[in-house]
């Protein structure tokens, strides 16, 4: 029986990962969560994990509910003996547990794009040193991974990520009118609040471009974004002979989570079959309407700590927007200001965390 650790178990991806584990009959040996007491309690009761990580404020109540429960840090949960760790703690908070999982040599099903964006070269160095696998959970990167299977790297001309365009592809005309409630209504995907807002600004696609650059170790100038409102095509690879290879599937993250857990095998699912689409639209992204995508590309051109800074600044800006402190168009403005002020230093674990802290404070100044 395959043993799985789920980091970020009470979040959207974490809960869907547990659904996949239930369908596949896997053993969940470790859970790491935040402060959602009731959701975590249900998971502990169902899975009876060996170790659990949660915010310290929950420890007393968890001990009362589950007297024999062993509490630990997220890094200790990540290091448990298991075949796979699902890394789904969002933001830079998920980086240390992801690194801990990589250092134990297990497969890491990576849903935390910020970890790869900020620390891609460092994580790959750790993975190669410890014999770990890193497989993507993001639908677009899973699509590219699948389309690249069996192909020679020198035959690949371009990687193409698709974006639904989010809820504001065409309206309202004035994005200053956008409220948090409007931004949280994504037309296609079931996701957490932060990534849903990022999808609305298209910064999520920018992060995915940077993730693709680091995950596939591919030149930024050969990674393209196309708006695809139907969201049937999740990613395409263009080859040097002009042909294209695409992955299509339903807009259900469980499909991509399962693939990261079962690869190289495929397993049956109870998911609905994709209806054969009548029309597939592909549009160029409007960088004037969605400048956050342009900021992400500029961060990618600078590389290293610039990617760390914009990722950290975005967490602060999105939280400020969700709290009603700033208007929607202010998010990309904050990212651009932080990027311009980012110091140029070599990327190390120490400089990464230092710039992450600096960028958050800098973003708060503008928020």
Curated annotation (Swiss-Prot):
Ligand binding (Mn(2+)): 138, 140, 208
GO biological process: isopentenyl diphosphate biosynthetic process, methylerythritol 4-phosphate pathway involved in terpenoid biosynthetic process
Record keyword Ribonucleoprotein present: no
One MF annotation (Gene Ontology) recorded for this entry: NADPH binding
Pfam families cross-referenced by the UniProt entry: DXP_redisom_C (PF08436), DXP_reductoisom (PF02670), DXPR_C (PF13288)
Entry's EC annotation: 1.1.1.267
Known catalytic reactions: 2-C-methyl-D-erythritol 4-phosphate + NADP(+) = 1-deoxy-D-xylulose 5-phosphate + NADPH + H(+)
InterPro entries according to UniProt: DXP_reductoisomerase, DXP_reductoisomerase_C, DXP_reductoisomerase_N, DXPR_C, DXPR_C_sf, NAD(P)-bd_dom_sf
Domain of life of the native organism: Bacteria
Pathway(s) the chain acts in: Isoprenoid biosynthesis; isopentenyl diphosphate biosynthesis via DXP pathway; isopentenyl diphosphate from 1-deoxy-D-xylulose 5-phosphate: step 1/6
Family that this chain belongs to: Belongs to the DXR family.
General function of this protein: Catalyzes the NADPH-dependent rearrangement and reduction of 1-deoxy-D-xylulose-5-phosphate (DXP) to 2-C-methyl-D-erythritol 4-phosphate (MEP).
The protein, known as: 1-deoxy-D-xylulose 5-phosphate reductoisomerase
Native organism: Thermus thermophilus (strain ATCC BAA-163 / DSM 7039 / HB27)
């Amino acid at each position: 029986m395959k043993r799985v650790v789920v980091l970020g178990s009470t979040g959207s991806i974490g809960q869907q990962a547990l659904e996949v584990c239930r369908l596949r009959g896997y053993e969940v040996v470790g859970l790491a969560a935040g402060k959602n007491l009731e959701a975590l309690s249900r998971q502990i009761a169902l899975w009876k994990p060996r170790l659990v990580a949660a915010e310290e404020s929950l420890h007393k109540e968890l001990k009362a509910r589950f007297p024999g429960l062993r509490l630990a840090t997220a890094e200790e949960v990540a290091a448990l003996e298991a075949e796979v760790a699902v890394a789904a703690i969002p933001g830079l908070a998920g980086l240390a547990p992801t690194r801990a999982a990589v250092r134990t040599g297990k497969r890491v099903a990576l849903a935390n794009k910020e970890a790869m964006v900020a620390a891609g070269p460092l994580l790959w160095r750790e993975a190669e040193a410890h014999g770990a696998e890193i497989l993507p959970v993001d639908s677009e990167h899973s699509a590219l991974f699948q389309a690249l299977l069996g192909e020679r790297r020198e035959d690949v001309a371009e990687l193409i990520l698709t974006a639904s365009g989010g809820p504001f592809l065409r309206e309202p005309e004035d994005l200053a009118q956008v409220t948090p409630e409007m931004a949280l209504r994504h037309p296609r995907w079931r996701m957490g609040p932060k990534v849903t807002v990022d999808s609305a600004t298209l910064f999520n696609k920018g992060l995915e471009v940077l993730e693709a650059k680091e995950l596939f170790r591919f030149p930024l100038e050969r990674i393209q974004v196309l708006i695809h409102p139907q969201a049937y095509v999740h990613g395409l690879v263009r080859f040097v002979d002009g042909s294209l290879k695409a992955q299509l599937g339903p807009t259900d993250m469980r499909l991509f989570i399962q693939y990261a857990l079962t690869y190289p095998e495929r397993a049956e699912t109870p998911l609905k079959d994709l209806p054969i689409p009548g029309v597939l639209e592909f549009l160029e992204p409007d960088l004037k309407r969605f400048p956050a995508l342009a900021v992400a590309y500029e961060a990618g051109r600078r590389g290293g700590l610039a990617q760390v800074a914009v990722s950290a600044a975005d967490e602060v800006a999105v939280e400020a927007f969700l709290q009603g402190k700033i208007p929607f168009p202010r998010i990309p403005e904050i990212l651009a200001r932080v990027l311009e002020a980012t110091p140029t230093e070599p990327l190390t674990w120490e400089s990464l965390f230092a710039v992450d802290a600096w960028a958050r404070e800098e973003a708060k100044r503008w928020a």
